[in-house]
C-alpha cells in the first residue's frame, strides 16, 4: 500500500505558504523577546501574547491556502483528524526558554494525511534557520539568506558514546517520586548529555550534531514536525515505550540516528519490570 505524501508541486506550494507565515510569526515573536508578560495555563506551563498572536497568524495562512483542512494548535485547539489532511501548529515550542530571553525556541508546523506526518518544519526564529522535510523528499536545512541543503543524521553509535539531547530532568526523576522514566539511569549509560531542549535538539539530530534526543512529555503539535524531519534525515523515532503506531498521539518521543540506539535508550529509561503496572 502506498503511504500518503505530497507531490513536488504540492510541496512547493506548501513551502511557499508556510515560509510566508514564518516571516510574520518571526517578526511578532522576536518583537516580544526580552519583554515578555507571562501568564500560566491550568497545567502550570507558561503562555505569552506572542504564543497566541503567532498561532493566529499561522491559522490565517493555513485557512487562506487550505480552507477545508482540519487544524489543531496548542493555543486555540481544534481536532486531531485521522482522515484526510490535518495541520498541527505549535507557535512557540520552548516557551520556558523564550520567556527567559534564551534563543532555544522554535515554531513547529506539520501536516498529517490520514494520521501520518507527511510534511514538517522546525523554524528557529532567533537562530534564523529552518529545518524542513516531506515524505520522500528528504530533510533540508535552510539558513536565512542562504540555500537549502540536505542534512542527515550521524553515523550509528553505541549508547555508551552517544551524544544525547534532553530538555530537563524535572519531568521524570525529580517529579512524581522518580518515575515513570529514569533519565538519571540513561545519563549514566550514555556518552554525553546536553540540556539543549525542545525542538532545537531534534533539529540538531537531523544534521548529525546530536545522536539522539528525548522528551518524556509531548503533544501532537510537537511530535508531527519533529518526527517527519528526523525520519527523512535517516533517523528512527518512537515513543519511550518503543511504539511507532499512531506516533502523534503518543505522550513521549525519542529520536535517534539508528534503530539500535533508539531501542537502547528506551531500555535505559524504562522502569524495572517489578515497577511496571
Model-derived regions, located:
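Conserved beta-strand segments of alpha/beta enzyme cores
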Residues: 37, 70, 191-192, 236
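Conserved beta-strand termini and adjacent loop/short-helix elements that scaffold enzyme active sites
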Residues: 41, 74, 196-198, 240
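Active-site-adjacent structural elements in enzyme catalytic cores
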Residues: 64, 72, 80-145, 228-231
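N-terminal subdomain of lithium-sensitive/metallo-dependent phosphomonoesterases centered on the IMPase/IPPase/PAP
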Residues: 1-92, 274-277
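Oxyanion/phosphate-interacting regions
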Residues: 1-16, 20, 181-188, 202-277
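Residue-level signal for inorganic ion chemistry
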Residues: 25, 29, 51, 62, ...
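Short, Asp-centered acidic motifs that coordinate Mg2+ and/or phosphate
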Residues: 70, 119, 163, 211-212
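Acidic beta-strand-loop-alpha-helix segment within the catalytic core
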Residues: 110-202, 250-277
Amino acid at each position: 500500500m502506498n503511504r500518503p505524501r505530497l507531490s513536488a508541486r504540492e510541496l512547493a506550494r506548501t513551502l511557499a505558504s508556510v515560509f510566508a507565515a514564518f516571516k510574520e510569526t518571526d517578526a511578532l515573536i522576536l518583537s516580544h523577546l526580552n519583554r515578555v508578560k507571562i501568564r500560566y495555563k491550568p497545567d502550570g506551563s507558561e503562555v505569552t501574547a506572542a504564543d497566541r498572536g503567532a498561532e493566529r497568524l499561522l491559522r490565517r495562512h493555513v485557512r487562506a491556502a487550505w480552507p477545508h483542512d482540519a487544524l489543531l494548535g496548542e493555543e486555540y485547539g481544534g481536532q486531531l483528524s485521522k482522515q484526510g489532511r490535518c495541520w498541527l501548529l505549535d507557535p512557540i515550542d520552548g516557551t520556558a526558554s523564550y520567556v527567559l530571553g534564551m534563543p532555544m525556541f522554535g515554531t513547529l508546523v506539520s501536516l498529517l494525511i490520514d494520521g501520518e506526518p507527511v510534511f514538517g518544519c522546525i523554524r528557529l526564529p532567533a537562530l534564523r534557520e529552518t529545518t524542513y522535510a516531506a515524505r520522500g523528499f528528504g530533510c533540508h536545512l535552510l539558513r536565512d539568506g542562504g540555500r537549502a541543503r540536505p542534512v542527515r543524521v550521524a553515523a550509528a553509535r553505541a549508547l555508551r558514546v552517544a551524544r544525547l539531547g534532553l530538555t530537563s530532568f524535572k519531568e521524570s526523576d525529580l517529579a512524581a517520586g522518580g518515575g515513570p522514566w529514569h533519565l538519571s539511569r540513561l545519563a549514566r549509560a550514555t556518552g554525553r548529555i546536553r540540556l539543549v531542549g525542545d525542538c532545537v535538539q531534534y533539529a540538531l539530530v537531523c544534521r548529525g550534531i546530536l545522536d539522539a534526543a528525548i522528551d518524556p512529555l509531548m503533544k501532537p503539535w510537537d511530535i508531527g514536525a519533529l518526527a517527519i524531519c528526523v525520519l527523512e534525515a535517516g533517523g528512527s523515532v518512537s515513543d519511550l515505550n518503543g511504539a511507532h503506531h499512531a506516533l502523534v498521539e503518543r505522550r513521549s518521543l525519542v529520536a535517534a540516528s539508528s534503530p539500535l540506539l533508539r531501542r537502547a535508550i528506551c531500555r535505559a529509561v524504562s522502569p524495572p519490570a517489578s515497577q511496571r503496572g
